[in-house]
A protein has these predicted regions:
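Short, surface-exposed ligand- or partner-binding patches at beta-edge/loop junctions that are enriched
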Residues: 84
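Sec-dependent N-terminal signal peptides
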Residues: 4-13
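Intrinsically disordered, low-complexity boundary segments flanking structured domains
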Residues: 10-11, 45-47
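Structural scaffold elements adjacent to functional motifs in cytosolic proteins
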Residues: 40-42
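Rhodanese-like catalytic fold shared by cysteine-dependent sulfurtransferases
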Residues: 3, 16-32, 38, 47-80, ...
Length: 121
């Protein structure tokens, strides 16, 4: 009986599923977004987005408190979400949040800085 709290804690931990997402390089990311069903998502600020972004990318700033609320309003759960930020740090945060909410996510691990493809302004 004295081990019950430990066992309950262990069971709750084992019941948690880690949020999974794919983190890929720029070349692989470019191949992923060739699929027109993939949703492109820029998680940088509006100012960064205005300076240039991957064509047809939606903008949801991950630094805003309502990031997940906006994501759930705009992003379909039945489509893959391909997301990026400037360098890869914010996108990992966004990818983890989205994956925890049931989204299938592919993240550009080196960010927009490494993007060699087309840029829309």
């Amino acid at each position: 009986m004295k081990h019950l709290p430990f066992l309950l804690c262990l069971m709750s931990f084992l019941g948690c599923k880690a949020a999974d997402f794919r983190s890929v390089d720029a070349e692989t990311f470019a191949k992923v977004i060739e699929d027109t069903t993939v949703v492109r998502l820029d998680v940088r600020t509006a100012n960064e987005y205005a300076q240039g972004h991957i064509p047809n990318a939606l903008l949801i700033d991950v630094t805003q408190a309502n990031f997940m609320q906006k994501a759930e309003q705009l992003l379909p759960k039945d489509k893959t979400i391909a997301l990026y930020c400037r360098s890869g740090r914010r996108s990992k945060n966004a990818a983890m949040q989205l994956a925890q909410h049931g989204y299938q996510v592919v993240e550009l691990n080196t960010g927009f800085n490494s993007w060699k493809g087309e840029v829309e302004r």
